[in-house]
């Protein structure tokens, strides 16, 4: 019992102390590095037409990304429900980065009786595809920059190559496992029999594995579906790059496509790291570091574009998220207290289409 209270106390310190402090430190560094008056001047002079266009592109990004998740789920569930659950995931991430990845399978289980492990598997596949898509697009951008004679920071090149290589290998392994589910589960069952585990626990592990692989069932689909999956991944992040480009145009910058996508890759990958609520401070800091490292400037305009982009993201995700609360019939209190929920039961089975009232 004491260990449980100690663990909960540490979680609270991390969530409400350390993570917000990271954002405060990031903002302090930005304030010391860039003239605040110049930033405010750039924001006041931002062109509304470009800002609205960026907001429209972000909306399309959310729609297309939800369509890809709808595809991963086998189109067994209404697209509108999938979109609103995705929106609630963004809302949860604003409150506590990483919470959205738990909220989405939890909501699928609640509304459509999808086993939690199977739902989580689809979310994990989503994130894997996101990192793969961004890294491969970014790597191509870096090669283009190098061919053009532009210098690319070694750390950015390393991030691009590392993430692209790692995600490609994981995708290949997942692809093979998803196409040989019975063999994988049988192999795990044989291994577990050699371990000092109770039969019930061993069977539970096999059930979880079966559910996880059920969530990756799309990797067993036809070639046209595979093309749609990977093509929609590239399309999703190219649309996101367009939204970032329009944010830059709002403050008078016109980055080259390779610079635009390369910097965006660094920003997106950084969101997998510990961050304060809403990524406030860290988003702007990584944006400035990445794009300045790629030679884009002046820094006041680069940071102003980051504030425009992030401001639109927060406004849209909060708006769509609260609309999603009404559509999915869940309260904000339930969503934000998700981490206090009892561990959901994993169940073997596919992605059922049964809806709860």
Where are these predicted regions, by residue range?
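Transmembrane helix-loop-helix hairpins in multi-pass inner-membrane proteins
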Residues: 1-41, 85-197, 280-357
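Helix-boundary and loop/linker segments of multi-pass membrane transporters
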Residues: 9, 39-47, 75-79, 111-112, ...
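Alpha-helical segments in transporter systems
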Residues: 12-15, 54-58, 126, 224-236
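Hydrophobic/aromatic residues in alpha-helical transmembrane segments
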Residues: 26, 64-69, 104, 240-247, ...
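Short helix-coil transition sites and intra-membrane helix breaks within transmembrane domains
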Residues: 59-65, 71-74, 93-102, 272-285
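Membrane-embedded helical hairpins/re-entrant loop segments and their flanking transmembrane helices
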Residues: 63-87, 247-262
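Membrane-interfacial helix-loop connectors
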Residues: 77, 248-308
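Alpha-helical transmembrane segments and their immediate interhelical loop/hinge regions
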Residues: 204-257
């Amino acid at each position: 019992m004491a260990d449980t209270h100690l663990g909960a106390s540490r979680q609270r310190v991390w969530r409400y102390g350390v993570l917000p402090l990271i954002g405060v430190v990031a903002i302090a560094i930005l304030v010391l590095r860039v003239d605040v008056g110049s930033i405010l001047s750039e924001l006041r002079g931002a062109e509304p037409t470009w800002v609205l266009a960026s907001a429209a592109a972000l909306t399309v990004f959310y729609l297309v990304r939800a369509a890809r998740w709808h595809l991963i789920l086998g189109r067994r569930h209404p697209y509108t429900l999938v979109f609103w659950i995705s929106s609630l995931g963004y809302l949860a991430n604003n409150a506590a980065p990483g919470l959205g990845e738990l909220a989405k399978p939890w909501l699928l289980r609640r509304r459509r009786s999808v086993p939690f492990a199977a739902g989580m598997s689809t979310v994990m596949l989503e994130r894997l595809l996101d990192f793969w898509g961004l890294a491969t697009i970014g790597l191509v951008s870096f090669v283009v920059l190098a061919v053009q004679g532009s210098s690319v920071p070694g750390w950015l090149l390393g991030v691009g190559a590392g993430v692209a290589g790692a995600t490609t290998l994981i995708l290949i392994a997942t692809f093979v496992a998803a196409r040989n589910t019975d063999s994988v589960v049988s192999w795990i069952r044989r291994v577990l029999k050699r371990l000092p585990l109770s039969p019930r626990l061993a069977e539970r592990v096999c059930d979880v594995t079966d559910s996880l692989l059920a969530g990756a069932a799309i990797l067993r689909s036809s070639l046209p579906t595979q093309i749609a999956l990977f093509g929609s991944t590239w399309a999703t992040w190219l649309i996101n790059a367009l939204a970032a480009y329009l944010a830059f145009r709002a403050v008078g910058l016109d980055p080259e496509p390779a610079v635009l996508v390369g910097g965006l890759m660094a920003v997106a990958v950084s969101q997998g790291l510990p961050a304060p609520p809403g990524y406030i401070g860290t988003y702007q800091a990584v944006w400035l570091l990445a794009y300045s490292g790629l030679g884009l400037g002046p820094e006041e305009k680069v940071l102003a574009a980051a504030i425009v982009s992030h401001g639109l993201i927060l406004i849209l995700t909060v708006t769509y998220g609260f609309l999603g609360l009404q559509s999915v019939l869940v309260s904000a209190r339930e969503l934000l207290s998700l981490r206090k929920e009892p561990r959901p039961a994993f169940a073997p089975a596919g992605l059922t289409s049964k809806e709860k009232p």
